[in-house]
Amino acid sequence: MKTFVAKPAEVKRDWYIVDAEGKTLGRMAAEIAARLRGKHKPEYTPHVDCGDYIVVINAEKIAVTGNKRTDKMYHHVTGYVGNLKSTNFETLVGSKPTRPVEFAIKGMLPRGPLGRAMLKKLKVYAGAEHPHAAQQPKELDL
């Protein structure tokens, strides 16, 4: 018996919608990352993008436990000498409400071209409205 290898053209991708309101950031991100990779499918192949499309709504209402709302820091380099910029979770949600969800999920995906292709199937929106009604996404309860 030969080992099954999924072919990119034969992968069936579904659309799912996740309501992030009141969900814990890391637990939700781990489940979404696994679905973006396609690990929930029996035909999962590590070197092929087998995952589904995921639409996350209400990202601004995500929950974090403990003191992470004020203590969790996000860093980025501006490209200028000595300019490492840092901001905490609360400030980042105030200015760019989708970023904490995107950063958490991106950190759980593989690095390289395959991981970037998987991340393109993630759509995150701050509010309850999204432009993907035509794809008829199924509700995903995490």
Curated annotation (Swiss-Prot):
Segment forming the signal sequence: none
Q: Which InterPro entries match?
A: Ribosomal_uL13, Ribosomal_uL13_bac-type, Ribosomal_uL13_CS, Ribosomal_uL13_sf
Q: Which Gene3D superfamilies match?
A: Ribosomal protein L13
Query: Which is one GO molecular function term here?
Result: structural constituent of ribosome
> Pfam families under this entry?
Ribosomal_L13
- Does the keyword Nucleus feature in the UniProt annotation? no
- A Gene Ontology term for the protein's cellular component: cytosolic large ribosomal subunit
Per UniProt, the keywords (alphabetical) are: Ribonucleoprotein, Ribosomal protein
What biological function has been recorded for the protein in this entry? Answer: This protein is one of the early assembly proteins of the 50S ribosomal subunit, although it is not seen to bind rRNA by itself. It is important during the early stages of 50S assembly.
Provide the family line: Belongs to the universal ribosomal protein uL13 family.
**What is this protein's name?**
Large ribosomal subunit protein uL13
Primary gene name: rplM
